[in-house]
From Swiss-Prot:
Biological classification of the source: Bacteria, Bacillati, Bacillota, Bacilli, Lactobacillales
Protein function: Catalyzes the 2-thiolation of uridine at the wobble position (U34) of tRNA, leading to the formation of s(2)U34.
Protein name as annotated: tRNA-specific 2-thiouridylase MnmA
Segments traversing the membrane: none
A GO cellular-component term linked to this record: cytoplasm
Length: 377
C-alpha cells in the first residue's frame, strides 16, 4: 500500500498563542504536521490584576518557552486600541443599555479573526490557528462548514458564530477533534511548559477579576428600587448593570413564612431604574416562548429558509432547544421555541445548529411569552 505524505512545509500557519495549553498544543501539532509555523502573542489589554501582577508578562514568557520547545519563531503584537474600539466600547454600551453583552463573540469576530488575521497576512500567512475547540469541513463547492468540537464540554462554536466564510477559509482548528484531557496528555508527553497550566476564565482577554468593581471603574452605578412584578418594594439594587436575568446571588432577599423559595432577577426597567425580582427558579416572568434577534450572521454565507426548524443555544454550554426561524424585512428575526426557555437575556448570543453544524447566530434583543414582551430591559 502506498502512503502519501503531504508536504506542508510551504504552507505558513500563524498561531495565536495565549500562553495556555490549548494554543500551545495547536502550535505543536501543526509543527508535527510539517507546516511552517509562526507563533504570535496578542496583548489586548493593560492587564495588571488585582494583586498588581501583569498577567500578560507571565503569559508571554510561557509563549516564549513553548515556542522554544517546539522550535518555532514567535512575535508579540499589541491590539489594545483595536480591542478598546471594537470590543470594549461595545461591552460598555451594552451595559449602559441594561443588556448583558457577550464580549467573547465580538472578540473572536473583531480581534482574533480580524485584526489578528490582518496582521498574519503581513507575515504571509496561508492560515491562522488558535486553541479553539471547533472543527471545519469543506464541501465540494468550496464552502466551509463549522462543526462542534468533539469535546462537548469544551465546544466553542457558540463563541465563533459570528465568523464569516472569508474568516473560516483562512482558519485551522487542530485540536477540534480532541478531548481536553487528550490535549493535556499531548502537552505533557512533549514536555511543554504549559502542560499543567490552568485554563483561563472570565471576560475575553480581561480575565478573572472582581467584575462589579471592574465595571464600576468605567460606568457610574445608579442604585434604585428592587420590586416584585406586582409592585411590592423589596429593597434597593446597586445598579442595573450589575444584574443579569435569572441571577440569584447578591440580591440580599430571603424567603418568607409563606414562601421559602429563593429570589431571582426577573426583569429590568431601564427608564425607571427598577430591578424586578420574583420567587422560584421557574418563575413565570422568567419563562419565554420566543425571542427577537438582530445582527444575524450565517457562517456559510447562506441564510436558512424561512420557517426552518433547527436547534439553538441561548447561553454557552446550554442544552440545545428546538426552534423555528421567521425573518422580518428589517433584517431581524423571530425565533419560536419548541418548549418554554428560562432566562432569555437581551445582549447575549443566540446560536443556531443543524445537528453538529453551527449555522451562525445573532444578538438577542427581546424575549416574549406568547407574543407579550417580557420586561427585560
Amino acid at each position: 500500500m502506498m502512503v502519501i505524505v503531504l508536504d506542508n512545509s510551504n504552507i505558513r500557519v500563524v498561531v495565536g498563542m495565549s500562553g495556555g495549553v490549548d494554543s500551545s498544543v495547536t502550535a505543536l501539532l501543526l509543527k508535527q504536521q510539517g507546516y511552517d509555523v509562526v507563533g504570535v502573542f496578542m496583548k489586548n489589554w493593560d492587564d495588571t490584576d488585582e494583586n498588581g501582577v501583569c498577567t500578560a508578562t507571565t503569559d508571554y514568557e510561557d509563549v516564549a518557552k513553548v515556542a522554544s520547545e517546539i522550535g518555532i519563531p514567535y512575535y508579540s503584537i499589541n491590539f489594545e486600541k483595536e480591542y478598546w474600539d471594537r470590543v470594549f466600547q461595545y461591552f460598555l454600551d451594552e451595559y449602559k443599555a441594561g443588556r448583558t453583552p457577550n464580549p467573547d463573540v465580538m472578540c473572536n469576530k473583531e480581534i482574533k479573526f480580524k485584526a489578528f488575521l490582518d496582521y498574519a497576512d503581513q507575515l504571509n500567512a496561508d492560515y491562522i490557528a488558535m486553541g479553539h475547540y471547533a472543527q471545519v469541513k469543506t464541501d465540494e463547492n468550496g464552502i466551509v462548514h463549522m462543526l462542534r468540537g468533539a469535546d462537548g464540554n469544551k465546544d466553542q462554536t457558540y463563541f465563533l458564530s459570528q465568523l464569516s466564510q472569508d474568516q473560516l477559509k483562512k482558519s485551522l482548528f487542530p485540536i477540534g477533534h480532541l478531548q481536553k484531557p487528550e490535549v493535556r496528555k499531548i502537552a505533557e508527553a512533549a514536555g511543554l511548559a504549559t502542560a499543567k497550566k490552568k485554563d483561563s476564565t472570565g471576560i475575553c482577554f480581561i480575565g478573572e477579576r472582581n467584575f462589579k468593581q471592574f465595571l464600576s471603574t468605567y460606568l457610574p452605578a445608579q442604585p434604585g428600587k428592587m420590586m416584585t412584578v406586582d409592585g411590592v418594594e423589596m429593597g434597593t439594587h446597586d445598579g442595573l448593570m450589575y444584574y443579569t436575568i435569572g441571577q440569584r446571588q447578591g440580591l440580599g432577599i430571603g424567603g418568607n413564612s409563606d414562601n421559602s423559595e429563593p429570589w431571582f432577577v426577573v426583569g429590568k426597567d431601564l427608564d425607571k431604574n427598577i430591578l424586578y425580582v420574583g420567587q422560584g427558579f421557574d418563575n413565570p416572568a422568567l419563562m419565554a416562548t420566543s425571542l427577537s434577534a438582530s445582527n444575524l450572521n450565517w457562517t456559510t454565507g447562506q441564510a436558512p429558509a424561512e420557517g426552518t426548524h433547527m436547534t439553538a443555544k441561548f447561553r454557552y454550554r446550554q442544552r440545545d432547544t428546538g426552534v423555528t426561524l421567521h425573518y422580518h424585512d428589517d433584517g431581524t428575526a423571530t425565533v419560536d421555541f419548541d418548549v418554554p426557555v428560562r432566562a432569555i437575556t437581551p445582549g447575549q448570543a443566540v446560536v443556531f445548529y443543524d445537528g453538529d453544524e453551527c449555522l451562525g447566530g445573532g444578538t438577542i434583543d427581546a424575549a416574549y411569552a406568547h407574543t407579550n414582551e417580557l420586561q427585560y430591559v
